[in-house]
Amino acid sequence: MTINKGTKHHDIKARIIGVHQDLFDITCSLGTGLARIKQGSYRDSAAMYPTIGDQVLVNWQGPDQSIINTTLPRQSYFKRLDGASCGHWAQAVAANFDEVFIMQALGADFNLRRLERYLTLAWESGGVPVVLLTKADLVSSAELATKLTAAQEIAIGVEVLAISNQSHQGYSALQAHLQPVRTIVLLGSSGVGKSTLVNQLQQKCWQPIMIVPVIRI
């Protein structure tokens, strides 16, 4: 059956896969395209303003003309306070993920207090945390062992992996997390290797992976 992409279809379930200020990349059963917010839809529900990963209901009007009506309930989400509201309401920055890869580099970025705070954020988000200690190829075996043990003592009950995006050390242990029906979000400081990991993993499998914008804690 051929779908007429120009025909209007109301209340179609779609997912946000990209955000460009007031434009959103969406994907649904009818295809992919751009969508805008229905005027006035989020005036009284700013916290539910669409973000990447959200499931939404749209009026499909073609690849680049669809209208977002409402955001469906989230199973998990990260949020940060919106500066324009003087801290009165929070803005979601990623939604509907299954696991949170908390990334810290095994060098100057390694910080147990920050790791503890990220773990709290991950559990509160509704996702399951996994700690990735990156750039394992840049430290000695002794330093790696010491920091791995320290992280495991902080992240009780959480899987902790040491990986290298250069040598692919630890990548085999990531395979259990790479399932097409699951979504992963990456959380960590700038420079720890988030974008590199995304590029490496998406060459090996098809799976939604999101990078959370900076959350200051």
Language-model region placement:
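Walker B catalytic acidic pair
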Residues: 135, 188, 211
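Conserved beta-strand/loop subsegment of P-loop NTPase cores
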Residues: 97-104, 125-136, 155-163
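Canonical P-loop GTPase G-domain recognition
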Residues: 138-192
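Histidine-anchored nucleotide/phosphate-binding helix
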Residues: 113-128
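N-terminal accessory targeting/assembly segments
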Residues: 1-112
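Walker A/P-loop
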Residues: 195-196, 200
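Flexible beta-alpha connector loops of hexameric P-loop NTPases
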Residues: 107-108, 137, 213-217
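Switch I (effector-binding) loop of TRAFAC-class P-loop GTPase G-domains
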Residues: 203-217
